[in-house]
């Protein structure tokens, strides 16, 4: 990690704006998981069909993520972010108008298209502005918005229980449309003289999708990161997709309370974990370039017994302890993924690389979420999938230790490896 360069003037403003964007991004995608009972009462569907609503979103979202990352590498990151936010917010509002299962399924797929562009572009924009020992913390702050959005997703079940499921989609869709207008005024890419990406652009480097994919998969480090991030999706998406239902049935909670317990405790703890992990990695990186890798591995090692506690204890207070510990430590993986990519990838392909990782994670996560619904229809406990998620985290922690800093097969100087 090089000495801290002077940050561009808007560096922390950008983090604040993207914090709100990340909050809306995840709130709009997860509210549907907390209103299962109300939604099924209004639009008849099987458990597998309910699971398919999340799976369809993930398949489209993941499938388009590499292309979405390429757009952020090739064009203005800020414009990609603004367009993505406006379109997915409009689709969130349109979801409230759905009357049939088929219409609901279509809106979820369209949301996958529009939301795919946000996270790769947002995290790459943070990396553009924060090039020294503030990167992990800045990334953690932006992903903190994601955690808050996931936690607020529990409001979907609460609103649906007290009025109608469509009201939540109408409200949050309109909020997102208004905020997109705010970003149009305030969000900007960094000045061209700041950041290695601008330097590479001035040197005439051209980002092409085919060349980017070839460069990524010629790297042993990236292949390891690709497999690691995908396998980690088993645990992450199982908790997001089925924890509210598991708590509702296992502990006999009403829908609204189950949704809040499943989202608030995990995501508030994750918010703290993002900051703790970011600060820890930033400080450690001053003496060890693999700090972001080690911090992530340690976090996964703690998250495994935490999720096992949730799915085995008969006591709700102990389950909440497990959810808090899981949320706190699994967050290390999220806040350090972009810094890890900055250690191992050609700087021109950072957003594309993150998009490719999202593809595999969403394919795995979507299959796992759908499997949860299919297993419920077959009267098999969802807790079995939580156990499989814990096993996947053990594998991920081991794989991380084989990733080493350095960009293979590129002529970019060593000083440019920090994006």
Write out the residue ranges for each language-model feature.
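Juxtamembrane intracellular "pre-TM" segments in multi-pass secondary transporters
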Residues: 2-7, 191-226, 250
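Residue-level signature of mid-helix packing/kink "hotspots" within the transmembrane helices
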Residues: 30, 58-66, 150-151, 267-275, ...
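Extracytoplasmic gate region of multi-pass secondary transporters
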Residues: 32-33, 220-275, 330, 334, ...
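Helix-breaking motifs and short loop linkers at transmembrane-helix boundaries and internal kinks
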Residues: 44, 76, 97-103, 131, ...
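Conserved MFS/SLC helix-loop-helix module at the cytosolic interface between two early adjacent transmembrane helices
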Residues: 63-99
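Structural signature of the two symmetry-related core transmembrane helices
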Residues: 79-93, 291-307
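Cytoplasmic helix-loop-helix junction between adjacent transmembrane helices
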Residues: 107-145
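Helix-loop-helix hairpin linking two adjacent transmembrane segments in secondary transporters
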Residues: 142, 146-189
């Amino acid at each position: 990690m090089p000495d801290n360069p002077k940050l561009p003037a808007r560096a922390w403003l950008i983090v604040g704006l993207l914090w709100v964007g990340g909050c809306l991004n995840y709130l709009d995608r997860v509210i549907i998981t907390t209103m299962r009972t109300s939604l099924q009462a209004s639009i008849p569907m099987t458990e597998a069909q309910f699971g398919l609503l999340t799976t369809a979103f993930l398949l489209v979202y993941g499938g388009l993520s590499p292309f979405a990352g390429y757009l952020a590498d090739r064009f203005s990151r800020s414009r990609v972010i603004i367009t993505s936010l406006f379109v997915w917010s409009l689709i969130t509002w349109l979801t409230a108008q759905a009357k049939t299962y088929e219409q609901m399924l279509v809106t979820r797929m369209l949301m996958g298209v529009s939301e795919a562009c946000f996270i790769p572009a947002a995290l790459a924009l943070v990396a553009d502005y924060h090039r020294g020992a503030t990167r992990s913390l800045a990334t953690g702050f932006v992903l903190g918005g994601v955690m808050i959005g996931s936690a607020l997703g529990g409001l979907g079940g609460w609103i649906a229980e007290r009025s109608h499921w469509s009201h939540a989609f109408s409200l949050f869709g309109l909020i997102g449309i208004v905020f997109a207008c705010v970003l149009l005024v305030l969000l900007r890419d960094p000045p061209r003289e700041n950041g290695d990406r601008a330097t590479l652009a001035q040197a005439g480097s051209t980002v092409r999708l085919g060349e980017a994919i070839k460069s990524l998969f010629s790297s042993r480090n990236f292949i390891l990161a690709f497999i690691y991030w995908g396998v980690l999706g088993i645990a992450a998406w199982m908790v997001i997709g089925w924890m509210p239902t598991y708590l509702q049935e296992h502990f006999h909670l009403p829908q609204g309370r189950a949704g809040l317990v499943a989202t608030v405790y995990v995501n508030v703890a994750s918010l703290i974990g993002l900051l703790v992990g970011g600060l820890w990695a930033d400080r450690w990186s001053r003496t060890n370039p693999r700090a972001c890798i080690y911090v992530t591995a340690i976090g996964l090692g703690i998250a495994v017994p935490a999720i096992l506690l949730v799915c085995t204890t008969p006591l709700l207070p102990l389950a909440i302890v497990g959810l808090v510990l899981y949320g706190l430590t699994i967050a290390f993986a999220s806040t350090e993924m972009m810094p890890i990519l900055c250690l191992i990838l050609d700087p021109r392909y950072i957003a594309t690389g993150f998009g490719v990782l999202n593809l595999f994670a969403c394919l795995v996560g979507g299959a796992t979420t759908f499997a949860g619904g299919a297993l419920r229809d077959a009267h098999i406990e969802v807790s079995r999938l939580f156990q499989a998620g814990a096993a996947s985290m053990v594998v991920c922690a081991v794989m991380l230790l084989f990733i080493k800093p350095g960009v293979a097969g590129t002529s970019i100087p060593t000083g440019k490896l920090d994006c």
